[in-house]
Amino acid sequence: MTMTRRQAIKTTLLAGGVLTSSGFRNLQGQSPSPGGATPPAPAPTGPFKVPPLPYAYDALEPYIDKETMTIHHDKHHAAYVKKLNEAVAQQPELGQMEIADILKDLTKVNEAIRKTVRNQGGGHYNHSLFWQMMKPGGGGAPQGDLAKAVAGKFGSYGDFKTKFTAEAMGVFGSGWAWLVLNGKELAIEQTPNQDSPISQGMTPLLGIDVWEHAYYLKNQNRRADYIPAWLNVVNWDFVSERYQKAMG
């Protein structure tokens, strides 16, 4: 029997990650919301840990399906953490640092493991933010100071959404689109693979994962369907908190 592309990718997604832990090392001193609904997992085998989701796997439906969330969190994110821990075992002092601080200055990382730490550490950092950037009942538009900043930079929230969507659609292959602070100014940026804006001296506020594993089971290759659906679960409260903290 011929396997469809969707079936093949599903098989790859299930096999591609190795489940480790549902705990996590603090991300820039922040923890996800307490009471996360993901089940406990075995103790981690290194200093970096996968954060538990702050909501149930199916909590973002109908926009993001349960199966995608389960595989994305328990397999893909866990695989990034496993490989990151294997790499930092070769330079143990990195295990005493926050992943954000490592990514801000990768010259501190031994050249032999630098590429691995950049890729796997970026995957861990990006996804640890990503889970918190979404919530059940999310979406809508930002409020308060962030809303004013968005309007001042882009014209309106609608204009921001149009530009952000275009940037996310324009990511070639796998990567992310971000709303960032570059200094004290808002900007929309792309990063390839698991690169993070933090490595370029910018503060990520909001990011959408446009790797196919983030949407293929539900949307197949239709990234144009995934992006507007994802905007319905954005946790603007979390994004605003990051904005306020970064602006001081």
Please name every model-derived segment.
Residues 7-29:
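N-terminal export signals
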Residues 1-3, 7:
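Secretory targeting signals
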Residues 23-60:
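C-terminal segment of N-terminal export signals and the immediately downstream linker at the start
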Residues 166-220, 227-237:
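An amphipathic alpha-helical core segment
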Residues 59-61, 106-112, 192-195:
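Acidic/His metal-coordination segments adjacent to aromatic residues that form catalytic metal sites
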Residues 46-82:
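Mature N-terminal segment immediately following signal peptide/propeptide cleavage
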Residues 234-238, 242, 246-247:
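Low-complexity, Gly/Ser/Thr/Pro-rich intrinsically disordered linker/tail segments
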Residues 75, 81, 86-96, 100-182, ...:
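All-alpha RGS (Regulator of G-protein Signaling) helical domain and cognate RGS-like helical scaffolds
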